[in-house]
Amino acid sequence: MYDYIKGQLTKITAKYIVVETNGLGYIINVANPYSFTDSVNQLVTIYLHQVIREDAHLLFGFHTEDEKDVFLKLISVSGIGPTTALAIVAVDDNEGLVNAIDNSDIKYLMKFPKIGKKTAQQMVLDLAGKFVEAPQETGNTKARSNKAGNTQLDEAIEALLALGYKAAELKKIRAFFEGTSETAEQYIKSALKLLMKG
């Protein structure tokens, strides 16, 4: 198992980042790849969780140990796999997640992709009281000026599709943001907040 990786961030895609260390490039699945935009070609430290499957060895990466801890708690719930947990972590609203779990807010939990009523109930059952204090806000929240526009919105929509959101939902999101100028990271964060409001 790996705890973290320190290396040069060499590539960002809608689903993952690539970190090079000792001549090897590691594909790391992350909640919001575009939150790493300012770190391209720089030394980064990414906290890791490794999933070994019959057909693949997957790495899931996080900005902070708190973010990783939330992910690990989520995958301990029956019915939640790493991809679904990553989509939940991507919302970047751990306080809302913790409140929903502690207050048995099944409706809120069902807004996450691939979370049905049974899984939401299981989350409440398994995780109520497990979050001693709400984790720090995750991700890189620095505001930045970046060339934006439709390309950035396209990248954000692609990343949201990779997280499991439906194209029909994202069509409304695209229409909402059309004509605005943000970074892909900002579009993703704003879109996730809108998707959670329903």
Curated annotation (Swiss-Prot):
Main location: cytoplasm
Region spans: Domain II: 64-142
Assembly with partners or alone: Homotetramer. Forms an RuvA(8)-RuvB(12)-Holliday junction (HJ) complex. HJ DNA is sandwiched between 2 RuvA tetramers; dsDNA enters through RuvA and exits via RuvB. An RuvB hexamer assembles on each DNA strand where it exits the tetramer. Each RuvB hexamer is contacted by two RuvA subunits (via domain III) on 2 adjacent RuvB subunits; this complex drives branch migration. In the full resolvosome a probable DNA-RuvA(4)-RuvB(12)-RuvC(2) complex forms which resolves the HJ.
Molecular function in Gene Ontology: ATP binding; four-way junction DNA binding; four-way junction helicase activity
Name of the encoding gene: ruvA
An example Gene Ontology biological process: DNA repair
Protein name: Holliday junction branch migration complex subunit RuvA
Renumbered residue ranges of the record's region Domain III: 148-198
Keywords, comma-separated and alphabetical: Cytoplasm, DNA damage, DNA recombination, DNA repair, DNA-binding
Entry function: The RuvA-RuvB-RuvC complex processes Holliday junction (HJ) DNA during genetic recombination and DNA repair, while the RuvA-RuvB complex plays an important role in the rescue of blocked DNA replication forks via replication fork reversal (RFR). RuvA specifically binds to HJ cruciform DNA, conferring on it an open structure. The RuvB hexamer acts as an ATP-dependent pump, pulling dsDNA into and through the RuvAB complex. HJ branch migration allows RuvC to scan DNA until it finds its consensus sequence, where it cleaves and resolves the cruciform DNA.
Compartments, record wording: Cytoplasm
Domain of life: Bacteria
Domain characteristics, as noted in the entry: Has three domains with a flexible linker between the domains II and III and assumes an 'L' shape. Domain III is highly mobile and contacts RuvB.
Region described as Flexible linker: 143-147
